[in-house]
Amino acid sequence: MRLARRRARVRWDEVRKEMNAHGVSVVEIQKGANGEWEMLNNGQNRRITAFTEMEITGPARGSELLVTAFSPNATRTRGTLNNCGSGFTPWGTYLISEENWAGYFHPDASIDPVPRELARYSVSGWQGNFWYDAQEGGIVTSDDNFSRFLTAATGADASEDFRNEPNNFGWLGGVRPV
């Protein structure tokens, strides 16, 4: 019953608002002459949301586990969802850490049991939201910003669908420039 009620409200405009509300804010501040903190308007301030395109760097770049229809060569990804700890390293890199992201993804309902690769991340049920099923005017959109949250293997390989999309979340990320 809960599933049916929630799914009835999945509209693309609501989902877009939810996705923009997730992420992290980067804001530069300074202490003013009066002792109050103030935001600096210097072009560095921004939101990093579920839609933000990012470059994959380091040893994971190009990994077959990160291949998706969005990035067949596994060099780019999109978004960050729930960030808990963040802060600066001694060398000045701003780090964000992502948690509690698994409930945003839904496995292929026709596969039982859920593949080990998804189950180990708790991407194993139909709990959470239904971003993958966003509808515009009652029609499921083809916008892969939404469908990427359904991890079904619908293509000939991972470069044609989003079966690997969960692997693009849950990372410790560096934000540049700060």
What are the functions of these language-model segments?
Residues 1-178:
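Conserved small-residue
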